[in-house]
Regions:
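Asparagine-rich low-complexity intrinsically disordered tracts
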Residues: 20-21
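N-acyltransferase acceptor-side catalytic subdomain
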Residues: 2-11, 25, 31-33, 39-374
Length: 374
């Protein structure tokens, strides 16, 4: 279900897109050449009036098929709505498609789509890629994507734009919501914890939602902006602070501390009893693994049913993550997102990772004393 054919077959002409936008259907005349005579035994060539008739039949067939689609997945109707209600975004869509041919082969998503139905279609078509794309990068739409099981990452693509009567190449922001043909997931109880982690974890504390900005800074410091561009950070922060809410989607930060130093952390989100790890960092050797192991125990303690780790990578497999097909993932996701699970450090604002990972035994005496004093 590529974007290319759907948009090019639309009758809408975009105001504001380069070169007057995309041509309307039927604008180019049909070439009419001389048709040879039919001889006995020869293949009969099409008559001059049969080609337009064939095109009309195909057009009517396409319209009939389109009329059976829900408005939430009918791209022609969505384009009509965009043209009336959000022409600036529609012009941006055409400009990006014109300058970046690869976008023609990925599904376009907008706030006007029925996202759940789009997922069903991708599963039915056995969609083997991981990318979709959209130009709407606001917090509300990001929440909607998270609720439906997408992992929204950001990108910047080159487009040509007229500036002071000169054509200039600029970079346009867009989202690349990931759907993943194979997902890395696990139940929190399936975590694999090494002896090294069990030994080192006693010196670390875990917190939740204590330093969102610090975690963002750590991620950019470690990985560069990568996909976490400033405009995405801004929208994530709005979701985190609940300036924007959508159903039960919540944005969180997880911090790992060592002697007051932020040693590792991640940004994640919860939807019902599902926790999704979005991106993270570490500043000390092994700190990232300790943070993940402590997080798994925290999720298990608070009865989360699914830990979504996104794309499968070797380190995720090492801690126990499994490969799950797109179909199976969304089957589980649509059940667990309607359940309830709290996400916080229990009983206090911070917790020693030795307590979470090893239990109350084999923890430094001062930690035991602290726990009993709470």
């Amino acid at each position: 279900m590529s974007t290319c054919g759907s948009l090019e077959n639309s009758d809408i002409q975009v105001q504001g897109a380069e070169n007057g936008g995309t041509s309307q259907k039927g604008e180019n005349p049909v070439d009419e050449g001389n048709v040879g005579e039919t001889k006995s035994g020869d293949i009969k060539p099409a008559h001059m009036d049969e080609e337009p008739k064939k095109e009309e039949e195909e057009e009517e067939k396409a319209k009939l098929q389109a009329s059976t689609l829900d408005d939430g997945v009918n791209i022609s109707r969505i384009i009509e709505r965009l043209a009336k209600e959000d022409p600036q975004s529609l012009a941006k869509i055409y400009s990006l498609m014109k300058s970046n041919n690869c976008l023609n082969f990925y599904p376009l998503l907008t706030p006007y789509h029925n996202i759940e139905r789009i997922v069903d279609i991708l599963i039915e078509e056995n969609y083997e890629h991981e990318n979709t794309w959209c130009v709407h990068c606001d917090a509300v739409f990001i929440c909607q994507l998270l609720y439906e099981g997408f992992i929204p990452v950001a990108s910047k693509q080159k487009v040509c734009r007229m500036v002071n009567n000169e054509t200039k190449v600029v970079k346009e922001c867009l989202l690349i919501p990931k759907i993943h043909y194979v997902r890395s997931c696990m139940h929190p109880s399936e975590i694999h914890i090494s002896r090294k982690v069990k030994k080192k974890c006693k010196s670390y504390y875990i917190t939740v939602d204590k330093d969102f900005d610090g975690v963002l800074q750590g991620i950019v410091e470690k990985h560069g902006q990568n996909w976490l561009y400033p405009f995405v950070q801004k929208e994530f922060k709005r979701i985190f602070e609940e300036q924007v809410t959508y159903k039960n989607v919540r944005m969180h930060s997880v911090e790992l501390w060592c002697d007051g130093f932020l040693a590792a952390g991640e940004i994640g989100c919860t939807v019902g009893s599902i926790y999704t790890s979005l991106t993270g960092f570490q500043r000390k050797n092994c700190a990232g693994t300790i943070q993940l192991c402590a997080l798994a125990k925290l999720l298990q303690h608070q009865q989360f049913d699914l830990w979504d780790l996104g794309m499968l990578l070797p380190y995720k497999k090492t801690i126990g993550s499994k490969e799950i097909s797109m179909k199976d993932f969304f089957k589980m996701h649509r059940v667990f997102k309607h359940k309830t699970a709290p996400f916080r450090v229990p009983f206090q604002d911070k917790l020693n990772c030795g307590i979470l990972i090893n239990g109350t035994e084999d923890v430094r005496p001062e930690v035991n004393a602290e726990m009993h004093s709470e």
